[in-house]
Amino acid sequence: MQLNSTEISELIKKRIAQFDVVSEARNTGTIVSVSDGIIRIHGLSEVMQGEMIALPGNRYAMALNLERDSVGAVVMGPYADLAEGMEVQCTGRILEVPVGRGLLGRVVNTLGEPIDGKGEIENDGFSPVEVIAPGVIDRKSVDQPVQTGYKAVDSMVPIGRGQRELIIGDRQTGKTALAIDAIINQRDSGIKCIYVAIGQKASTIANVVRKLEEHSALQNTIVVVASASESAALQYLAPYSGCAMGEYFRDRGEDALIIYDDLSKQAVAYRQISLLLRRPPGREAFPGDVFYLHSRLLERASRVNEEYVERFTNGEVKGKTGSLTALPIIETQAGDVSAFVPTNVISITDGQIFLESNLFNSGIRPAVNPGISVSRVGGSAQTKVIKKLAGGIRTALAQYRELAAFAQFASDLDDATRKQLSHGQKVTELLKQKQYSPLSVAQQALVLFAVEFGYLEEVDLDRIGSFESALLEYANHNYADFMRELTQSGNYNDEIKESLKGILDSFKANSAW
């Protein structure tokens, strides 16, 4: 068979015309060094700050340092098998985590992957971990309460929906216990909860999850875990991941509560990353932007107005406000609240609950120090009945503390001083509360009414605990409807005052506690 040159030429032209050229421009680079979870990459000329970089083995790193001829990135996950010369590439994306109702009741890692062995999670989409906080115009003032179930907190340092209230204290003073009880108390309130565990032992986190399950609170909670065995990068990013999951509910006109346990360990993880990236250290070897690390996180906790929710949901949700309430936890060393990170977070938040080791060790639990614990915006959100009845509590305790200090040196005290000291001791005793036993609004109101109107004067100090438990049992058994209505309404008027007085008078007449 003989082919002439014309046919060959036509055939080649035809094949060339049919050839489909698919070209893909990729921005690739090469690893030049690996050390302690930090990789330096040469060649990624178009990488962005915070961009995800694809590594071999379906892993990612986050670009944090953009230098003249190299990129410093932190590896998210194991890095032992990474070596110099390996090729990496840009993804053009920043870190996103799954969000949605499918996460409720689940335990996930920083990247939103399930680690509880309950199968895949059905998420409603993905959200970037770094989001700009809502602006001033999009916000609404805090005027609805978050009940923790603790008498000492709800009466003296009330928390509102959309507030940032710091829980601060030394190790082993009951900070996590207070936060977990606050989550348990939201079982029937409709508030979704997110618990972010940063740098804790896996056994401690497992215990928290078990307790939430035992008290039927886990189905309403997302647990985000970056344990002590995880890399510094995952511990640093965990609060932002949890916040993105909480914002899903806030932006759809619902209420959410997020616990960061604790931000001291996140700051240490960020310090580790910064020093490995050779950023200049500042006070206590923290980098210069450690304030911004926490401020950009905590500013995302807010109460947003109806227009914001309507705009975000494209008109699907109308006339509803959303809120994300944050309870960050900070661990102090020997009660030093003037250290770098504690002062930073105190200045960012709307108040703090200071837990003191001396009070804790003397059996006063929760160990709230009423002198320096404050809620800057929670007063306007406090339930009316609690606000009305709790007015004298803080004053009584402050006067008691002052008098108690002087009474140690005084040999003879007048009757008025003795009476004030006795009253202060009884109030202190009454504010004690066991873990996992939150009180409803009506129960708290009844106890505070007893304090306010002198029903404790005839009760001996060592009988205060049994007096309270017997009173609450009596009220729940005989006045269940009234207690339920008072919890739901939270109002206070002459009729309610008479009803509370009637319960206490009836209890005193009939009960042998």
From Swiss-Prot:
SUPFAM superfamilies, alphabetically? C-terminal domain of alpha and beta subunits of F1 ATP synthase (SSF47917), N-terminal domain of alpha and beta subunits of F1 ATP synthase (SSF50615), P-loop containing nucleoside triphosphate hydrolases (SSF52540)
Q: How does it assemble?
A: F-type ATPases have 2 components, CF(1) - the catalytic core - and CF(0) - the membrane proton channel. CF(1) has five subunits: alpha(3), beta(3), gamma(1), delta(1), epsilon(1). CF(0) has three main subunits: a(1), b(2) and c(9-12). The alpha and beta chains form an alternating ring which encloses part of the gamma chain. CF(1) is attached to CF(0) by a central stalk formed by the gamma and epsilon chains, while a peripheral stalk is formed by the delta and b chains.
Q: What is the source species?
A: Pasteurella multocida (strain Pm70)
Question: What are the residue positions of the site described as Required for activity?
Answer: S373
Cellular component GO terms, alphabetically?
A: plasma membrane; proton-transporting ATP synthase complex
Xref: InterPro entries: ATP_synth_asu-like_sf (IPR023366), ATP_synth_asu_C (IPR000793), ATP_synth_asu_C_sf (IPR038376), ATP_synth_F1_a_nt-bd_dom (IPR033732), ATP_synth_F1_asu (IPR005294), ATPase_a/bsu_AS (IPR020003), ATPase_F1/V1/A1_a/bsu_N (IPR004100), ATPase_F1/V1/A1_a/bsu_N_sf (IPR036121)
Q: What chemistry does it catalyse, as a reaction equation?
A: ATP + H2O + 4 H(+)(in) = ADP + phosphate + 5 H(+)(out)
**What family is this?**
Belongs to the ATPase alpha/beta chains family.
Might you give the EC number(s) for this enzyme? 7.1.2.2
Which protein is depicted? ATP synthase subunit alpha
User: What EC class is this?
Assistant: translocase
